[in-house]
Amino acid sequence: EIIVGYVSILTDSMKLKILEDEETKKEICNELNISENNELPAIKIGRFAIDKKYAKQGLGSHILANVLLSMLKLSKTKIGFRVIIVEAYAIALDFYIKNNFYTRESDKEILKKIDMIKKQDPTRCFNIYLDLKDIKEEPKN
């Protein structure tokens, strides 16, 4: 067998006020009877990597789609959470954005310089997230 990539997943939380979508934020606040200053249960993708030999072939997006689908199922049966969070390296940020993750409003200005950051500090981390409601039920082929 060949290992072409790996992913680690752990439980975590994030402040509800970080969510960009005001409608979703209000919906969650009302549903759970909490304020936006509360922590929201989350699943965190701790590490996610694809062997360089297999990079740029769509394998990362395919694996991520299947991981997200598994997380969606987990949220319905085993673990109560609404968002998936990642501390993404600058060099991986485009990958996650392409796969529907959101950046934080507080990072919008610095992200205008992302190309420079990728060159000067490729492992700089950005906190990003994905709302479970944005996960499609079927994985990519």
What are these regions (language model features)?
Residues 75-77, 81, 86-113:
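Conserved active-site alpha-helix within GNAT-family acetyltransferase domains
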Residues 6-47, 109-116:
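Conserved acyl-donor/pantetheine-binding loop and adjacent beta-alpha core of acyl/acetyltransferases
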Residues 87-91, 109-141:
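C-terminal "cap" of GNAT-fold acetyltransferases
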Residues 1-5:
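Glycine-rich acetyl-CoA-binding "A-motif" of GNAT/NAT acetyltransferases
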Residues 15-17, 93-95, 136-138:
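Eukaryotic short linear interaction motifs
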Residues 46-56:
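A short, internal acetyl-CoA/4′-phosphopantetheine-binding micro-motif in the GNAT/acyltransferase core
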Residues 56-71:
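Conserved acetyl-CoA-binding loop-helix of GNAT-fold acetyltransferases
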